Each structure stands twice: as structure tokens, then as C-alpha cells.
Amino acid sequence: MSTGSISDVDEFHESELLDGLPKFGSGKDPGTSNESTEDSSNCEGASVSECTGKRRKSANMRRSAPNGVAQEGKQVQRNAANARERARMRVLSKAFSRLKTTLPWVPPDTKLSKLDTLRLASSYIAHLRQILANDKYENGYIHPVNLTWPFMVAGKPENELKEMLNSTRLCGTTAS
């Protein structure tokens, strides 16, 4: 931040001296000329912000000089990432469709969102846990006869079901 003090002028001169020196790890030796030193000599009459803007532009141009090669590399990476994402989404969609077909009380022609599918699967799992916990078999079937579609076990709302499940955890699992 410029305050107009003498120290600002000193900082400006120090930055000019440092601009002429090679940066650590830049891979350039001090004997080679670069565009930034040429730009700084052209900026003697210009303001500090104009000079730094020109230096930034020339540095960006140097970095992107092999523009075609860099763009091709980026495009290849982008295409590979897109292919991975498409494959991931195919696997996820297939898993959801298998989950929908395993839910016994959902009509096959019913369209369900992913959230609805997960909620129904959760209530079905809760029903199966309840059966295992109570050792109840209704008419000899282990099937969710009392389940109402969607999201209810034996007429209980989902929040009451969560409370019931938290009190009767199986296999030593902990509440999340």
C-alpha cells in the first residue's frame, strides 16, 4: 500500500533491482536476456501498475508459448475426465436400478428419484431389522405386508421409525 513516504520509493527501487535478477528455480541463468527486463526498460516513464501489467502479460505469453501442445494436453485430460465421469454415472445408475428392482412393494412401472429409492430402501431395511429383532413372521412370510408405500413401516412415520431403530441397534453398530 502506497503512503507516499520515502520507504515507498526505496521499495520501488528494490523491486526494480530484484526484477533484473533471476528468480530462484526459474531455470534461467543471469546471462540470458528475457522479455521482462526489456519491458522494464520500456517502462521507465510509465507508472508502476502499467509496468507490472506489461510484465505479467509477457510472462503469461511465455508460459503459454507452446499453446497448441498445452491445449491438446488439456483437451486430452478433459476428455479422459469426462469419460471417467460418464463411466461412474453409468455404474451409479445401474446400482440404483438394481436397488429399485429389489424393493419388493414398489410397482415395476413406478418412476422413483434417487432420493425416494434410498428412502424406500432404508424403510425396507428397517422393516427387515424389525422382523429380525422381534422374530415375527406374519402368516409365515418375511415380507413387508404391513408396509405402506412410500416411507412408512406399519403406518409409522419415518421419524418414529428412526427413534425405534436407534433403540434397537443390531450387530453393535453405533448411531451416526
Curated annotation (Swiss-Prot):
GO molecular function: DNA-binding transcription activator activity, RNA polymerase II-specific; DNA-binding transcription factor activity, RNA polymerase II-specific; DNA-binding transcription repressor activity, RNA polymerase II-specific; E-box binding; protein dimerization activity; RNA polymerase II transcription regulatory region sequence-specific DNA binding
Domain bHLH: 76-128
Keyword terms of this UniProt record: Differentiation, DNA-binding, Nucleus, Transcription, Transcription regulation
GO biological process, one term: skeletal muscle tissue development
GO cellular component: nucleus
Main location: nucleus
InterPro entries the record matches: bHLH_dom (IPR011598), E-box_TF_Regulators (IPR050283), HLH_DNA-bd_sf (IPR036638)
Any single Pfam family the record assigns to this protein: HLH
Compartment list: Nucleus
Positions with biased composition (Polar residues): 31-44
Tissues in which the UniProt entry reports expression: Expressed in the cranial paraxial mesoderm from 20 hpf and subsequently becomes restricted to the pharyngeal mesoderm that will form the muscle. Expression in the proepicardial organ is first seen at 40hpf in a cluster of cells between the myocardium and yolk. Also expressed in the developing arches. Expression begins to surround the heart by day 3 of development, and by 96 hpf, expression is restricted to the outer epicardial layer surrounding the myocardium.
Region called Disordered, residue ranges: 1-84
Domain of life: Eukaryota
Keyword Transcription annotated: yes
SUPFAM superfamilies: HLH, helix-loop-helix DNA-binding domain
Function, as annotated: Involved in epithelial-mesenchymal interactions in kidney and lung morphogenesis that include epithelial differentiation and branching morphogenesis.
Subunit structure: Efficient DNA binding requires dimerization with another bHLH protein.
Protein name: Transcription factor 21
UniProt gene name: tcf21
